[in-house]
Amino acid sequence: MKVALLMSGGIDSSYSAYLLQEAGHEVVGIYLKLHDNDLKHAQNIQNIEKVSQKLGIETHIFDAKELFKKHVYDYFVDSYQKGLTPNPCAFCNPFMKFGFALERALELGCEKIATGHYARVKEGRIQEAKDQSKDQSYFLFGLKESVISRLIFPLGDRLKSEIKPEALEILPWLGTLESYKESQEICFVESDYIDILRRHFPVEQKGIVQDSSGRVVGEHKGYMQYTIGKRKGFTVKGAHDPHYVLSIDPKENRLIVGSKEELAKNVVYADPFALPEGFEHFEGEVKIRYRSLKVKAEVRLDESGRLVAHLKEKVYGVANGQALVLYAEDLVIGGGWILDSSLKS
């Protein structure tokens, strides 16, 4: 089978190319230029060319910067301006890696597309990876069934800790790729997301900090530098116990802070993004952010079309803009973008 592989220049995607060949597939490499860091692109492409030459793989480089800016970068920047906490990786996947890249793969005559994601496919759905510590199923919740049917994840049944030693034993020359930095959570952010926002907004505008009763208790450095649940970077006069960001008011450049218990929520509201056809009601588990544990929940659509998840236990740090992802055991059912949350008795 002819399979397109999204290549990054690192060991994971390079070893994936070898595994696909070992499984009998004809591999075609694809590299996407998404951001404006040309130095990083040059290093990645140099690595990819080396891998392609060694394995005899045809590779194609596509410049998708304009599309990426429209669908992902602008969304990222706009979200922070609105006081939200965006999830650019989950937002990128349906549009870029499994949208634009899949279209290019089909044009090249490929039947399927593979990536180095730590995830699996089962029964037409995204399944969690064997390596729970590296599982990336959360970021893939937005993929349509028609896309999932074309996916291959060569690393999904492997442990991350075993891949590098195994790869270097079989393909010792992969050691020359060691200068490749392990991919960050956000590909276009070098060190701190604030550096990106600083190009567009005056992010250091100080503002007031209030407690949940409206009393002014301190000062912060600029609302875009905070997310729900953050407990550092602002002052609270006379405080002896930790204070956490409860909400962000972008119009007034104001933070509302309180105790950890005030941060607790058990109802989450989300804008549906990817749901099974005919979805009305679901009982299973949900995740409110990438590194959170799954929580049992009952989820339904309300009269206005919002997803409403009633959680069986309290969660902390629910941030508007993040993804609410639904799981039936280890299978991703769908999800949406968090709009709000509350605590109900």
From Swiss-Prot:
Q: Answer yes or no on keyword Ribonucleoprotein.
A: no
> What Gene3D superfamilies is this protein classified in?
Adenine nucleotide alpha hydrolases-like domains (2.30.30.280), HUPs (3.40.50.620), Translation factors (2.40.30.10)
Positions bearing the site annotation: Interaction with tRNA:
H117, Q322
Q: Does the keyword RNA-binding apply?
A: yes
Q: Where is this region: Interaction with tRNA?
A: 134-136, 289-290
**Entry keywords, A to Z:** ATP-binding, Cytoplasm, Disulfide bond, Nucleotide-binding, RNA-binding, Transferase, tRNA processing, tRNA-binding
Name the Enzyme Commission number(s) assigned to this protein. 2.8.1.13
Q: Which reactions is this enzyme annotated as catalysing?
A: S-sulfanyl-L-cysteinyl-[protein] + uridine(34) in tRNA + AH2 + ATP = 2-thiouridine(34) in tRNA + L-cysteinyl-[protein] + A + AMP + diphosphate + H(+)
One GO biological process this protein is involved in is: tRNA wobble position uridine thiolation
Primary location recorded for the protein, binned into one broad class: cytoplasm
The record lists ATP as bound by L6, M7, S8, G9, G10, I11, D12, S13, L32, G116
| Protein family according to the UniProt entry | Belongs to the MnmA/TRMU family.
For this entry, the protein name equals tRNA-specific 2-thiouridylase MnmA
